[in-house]
């Protein structure tokens, strides 16, 4: 989230501490905060960290479950406002495997008139990175690491399995 926030405008501000005045930084007065959109359920694990960086950001949710036969996302929840009027968005999804969920979320956000869309991940597969790029629905993709490849059932290798299952203790 820090890296995805890199291009937000900042301004210097005066800060008074108990030991004396100093200069700090703040988001610029004209900076429009991105809408944070965790892809449920795994994206919930990234939301607290994103709100620690951008505490005044609004949040919307997109609930997607992967169809294990087609590997495509099925929507079960969408609380994103109907018209974002160009507001920037950060999609929070810890794993970018096939990119089906990220592409679907980004297309839904485009349909709601989102501004710049940044997909923020912890772990990605090269196939997912390429699929997201080819889809053209996201303006940027930020990931902490890119693993080797996808296996025959669309999981990242070596990866960590299902990120939501890991977070919520499901076997």
Placement of each model-derived feature along the sequence:
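PRPP-associated nucleotide enzymes
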Residues: 1-171
